[in-house]
Regions:
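Short hydrophobic patches on amphipathic alpha-helices
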Residues: 45-46, 74
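Short acidic/histidine-rich motifs immediately flanking catalytic phosphotransfer sites
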Residues: 48-53
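Two-component/phosphorelay signaling modules centered on CheY-like receiver
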Residues: 12-39
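Active-site residues of response regulator receiver
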Residues: 56-59
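Short alpha-helical segment
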Residues: 40-42, 71
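Non-catalytic signal-transmission and effector/linker regions of two-component phosphorelay proteins
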Residues: 1-7
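The feature encodes the CheY-like receiver
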Residues: 61-63
Length: 78
């Protein structure tokens, strides 16, 4: 299977570790190229790394709007 690049956006360290572990074990073709724990860090990593897939915590930072706004911006601009 073809390899693909992933950025994981998660602000809870345990959740991030678990997500990375699942990807590593269940989808070995996925390369986690970056992680981010904030919106600002996500956009920085996104611009630098150009992922094929983003796994996004919709409740980032305890807010229900930050993750949704990131999704909207990604859809509209990319």
């Amino acid at each position: 299977m073809e390899r693909f690049k992933v950025i994981i956006v998660e602000d809870v360290p345990l959740e991030l570790k678990g997500t990375e572990g699942i990807l590593h074990n269940e989808m070995p073709e996925a390369d986690v190229i970056a992680t981010a724990d904030s919106e600002e860090e996500f956009w920085k990593q996104f611009r630098q790394n150009k992922p094929d897939l983003v796994l996004l915590d919709l409740g980032l930072g305890g807010s229900t709007t930050v993750g949704v706004e990131i999704c909207r911006k990604l859809k509209n601009e990319h």
